Amino acid sequence: MKGLKWRTTKSPVEFMLVKNWGATPTPYDWSQLYQGLQSGVVEGQYVASPWQHVAKLHEVAKYFTEIGGMWSGNILAMDAKQYNALSDQQRKWLHQAADAYGEKVNELDNAWIKNGEDAIKASAKEWYVPTEAEMTKWRAGAIGAWLDAKGTFEPEVAKRVLMEQGMDGFVAQL
């Protein structure tokens, strides 16, 4: 990635992540990304694969590396006052419904990811899956990005989100 102009959001963590990977972080608007890749204003991007398919980025970007670094969440939120007003039985029902929702959404999300990746692979010149040794280098950039961005996020919130994703080892390295 050395020297490549890599599209980032304005997230300080993503900016440092791309910089740690050796590319030149280039904050660039999502709605302009297709044209940016097409014209060479940006030469790469770090976007979850199904969104790349939805935005048809595979039409202008032909090389893909699968690093498993993107996560998308599907959440349910409720006002604490309303939640606290529920009876124990109502909370039990709510938790059961939320668990069922979570399972179904994960199932649908996984199918969406697979469909998007399959469509991209059909037109990509290359879909590369790094070796475990190569993944260690990708992960090192991520750890450095989080450390470099300290002070720009709430540590306890970040820790909880990462732990909920099963990233205990990653959190331990931070």
Functional labels for PLM-detected ranges:
Residues 2-174:
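N-terminal secretory/targeting leader peptides
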